[in-house]
Amino acid sequence: MNRRVAIINDLKRYDRMAYLNSVSIISAFGDRAYIDIEEDKKYDAFLSGYIADSSKILEYRELIGDAKLDNQRALFLCDPVFADNGKRYENITDTHIENYKKLMEVSDIITPNFTEALMLIDEPYKENCEKYKIIKYENDSKEKIDILSKKIIESFFPILNKIRFKKNQISVITGIELYNAVLTILDVYDGDHGKRQTTCNYSEKIEDRSGAGEIFDAMFFETSTNGFNLVDSLSATTSFINNSLRFSRDKNIDPKLGIFFEPILYENLMVMRNKLIERNKQFKGEENVRH
């Protein structure tokens, strides 16, 4: 699509491999990835992740806010990277978290993991974590999945209602561990019309590797702005991450080296493209039947 996408992520200093995941995926979709923001350039989208200096978070808020005023179609995906597995990262202060909240006030999409989501709204981690870890995912029938999803979504509404930082916002909470699966919650809230769509996505537990968050953000951004609806985008994104984790494991890649996905990126993009074509054909067929 040849869009200018600014990537704001201090992992380029600490974990270059994870950081480059974003660049690889954005480039594969035909967009141009820019490292950080230059004030004299115009951007079509912004992806933010780990920001080491808490004061810089507010600077980015102002820069992105001004950029979105100049280009109202510019999209901002904010991943407030500061914690995991119930614990903050070493250098994270209360100021970091408060400033991330302010940054999310100008974002269109937020993608915190479960720990970050709970910390952002001052909810206890252990109690919530234990509540979901006992839930068993059974996929032997669509009816069972639908019943489970409805139950989980209803239990999640108090969290989703608190974590929304602007009137119209897409919230994606990742890394929610169930007994035998990993859950991702997508909540699309349209405050202008009082509409809401919330859905669950279940994926296999494989293994933890650095860089999954950067892959998720870049792939979800690209698929959701390249013809996929948000539910299909989430499904395509989690499927790609799982395929990449399996590939890394099967190739005996050291987990310290992150996720090895480049050899299967093109193949997976072709699968996504074909699914999108089939879905569009199906949609057109349904439209013809209705008319």
Show where each model-derived region lies.
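Short, small-residue alpha-helix embedded
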Residues: 119, 206-230, 234-236
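Glycine-rich phosphate/adenosyl-contacting loop at the front of the ribokinase-like
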Residues: 1-36, 283-291
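A short helix->loop->beta-strand "cap" motif at the edges of active sites that frequently abuts
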Residues: 65-76, 165-169
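Short acidic/histidine-rich motifs immediately flanking catalytic phosphotransfer sites
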Residues: 40-45
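Short, well-structured alpha-helical segments that form the helix of a local strand-helix-strand
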Residues: 148-163, 229-245
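Conserved phosphate/ATP/ADP-binding segment of small-molecule kinases
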Residues: 90-196
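Short pre-catalytic strand/loop immediately N-terminal to key active-site residues, enriched for Gly-Thr
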Residues: 12-14, 197-211
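Charged C-terminal helix
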Residues: 231-291
